[in-house]
Structure formats: C-alpha cells, structure tokens
UniProtKB/Swiss-Prot annotation:
Catalyzes the hydrolysis of inorganic pyrophosphate (PPi) forming two phosphate ions. It is found in: Cytoplasm. Its EC number is 3.6.1.1. Mg(2+) 2 binds at residue 71. Homohexamer. InterPro entries: Pyrophosphatase (IPR008162), Pyrophosphatase_sf (IPR036649). PROSITE patterns: PPASE. GO terms for biological process: phosphate-containing compound metabolic process. The keyword Ribonucleoprotein does not apply. This is Inorganic pyrophosphatase. It is an enzyme of class 3 (hydrolase).
C-alpha cells in the first residue's frame, strides 16, 4: 500500500496515524515524503549540527495553515524508520512562527497498544521538562545558519489545542 493511502487516523482526533519522515536522533538531513508520489526525498542538508529530538512526521489528509500536512513529533524508546506509520494520540502542540508564517508542531505519543510506557502522558505538561526544552531549543535554532530563515517559538498548548488543530486541518484538506 502506498503511503498516500494511509488514513489520517483510526478515530480523529483522539487516535491518529503519523507517517514518519525523519527518525529521532538521525543525521542532520531533512527528509520529506512527496505528497504526490509517496517517495521519500532529501529536502535539504541542515546547516546546523543538530538532530531532531523526536521522530518527525505528518498526518495524511490534513492541511495546516502553512500549506503542508500537520507536522507531528513522536517520542519513542527507539528511532522509527522513515516511511513507517505509527498509531498515536495527541498530547500537545508547540506553537511557532517561521519566515513562512504559522508553523505548529503537534506532539503525540504512541498508542497504548504499541507501548504502555506513555499511558500516563495525557497532556504536554506530563512530558519530561527536559524533552520539552530539547524540542523547543531544536526548533528555535535549527535554521540559525540558513540565510533568510528564522523561527520564533511561542509556547506550548495542551492536548485539546492539538486535537482542535487536527480537526481544523482535516476539514481544511477535505474542503480544498
């Protein structure tokens, strides 16, 4: 099955499928799955010597305000392969703005059927403070050496805000 056929989730917005593009702690290469072919492309080599602190991907059949599918960070005990799909539940959102406009990043944890390790995490405030700081720091600085690019992190919002973002983005894609 093509990644293009992966549904947005099992029970939106509570139970979502995240298509992974970049594994946690991988080399500083930004991969993107082409939304027309489903192929994994190298988007760019990051200029900063930094790595994504969590697996990074998106929710199919959604459309964020930046014109792309909803971005999602997924902490896991092990890095996930690019092109893999993981069942998750949203727990929060990191609100940010970059040179192109609003660019929110959802945080979602693996579904309980995949791991009980995250069952106690119901909201972004249940995540370890160090992990939240690493995520914010990464996004504040990963574009520092790219001319004309910048990011401003505005702060964390809760699970309800993440779910609202999913619903709005799913509707936006459906009505496009």
């Amino acid at each position: 099955m093509s990644l293009l056929n992966v549904p947005a989730g099992k029970d939106l917005p509570e139970d979502i499928y995240v298509v992974i593009e970049i594994p946690a702690n991988a080399d500083p290469i930004k991969y993107e799955i082409d939304k027309e072919s489903g192929a994994l492309f190298v988007d760019r080599f990051m200029s900063t010597a930094m790595f994504y602190p969590c697996n990074y991907g998106y929710i199919n059949h959604t459309l964020s305000l930046d014109g792309d599918p909803v971005d999602v960070l997924v902490p896991t005990p092990y890095p996930l392969q690019p092109g893999s799909v993981i069942r998750c539940r949203p727990v929060g959102v990191l609100k940010m703005t970059d040179e192109a406009g609003e660019d929110a990043k959802l945080i979602a944890v693996p579904h309980t059927k995949l791991s009980k390790e995250y069952d106690h995490i119901k909201d972004v405030n249940d995540l370890p403070e160090l992990l939240k700081a690493q995520i914010a720091h990464f996004f504040e600085h990963y574009k520092d050496l790219e001319k004309g690019k910048w990011v401003k992190v505005e702060g964390w919002e809760n699970a309800e805000a993440a779910k609202a973002e999913i619903v709005a983005s799913f509707e936006r894609a459906k009505n496009k």
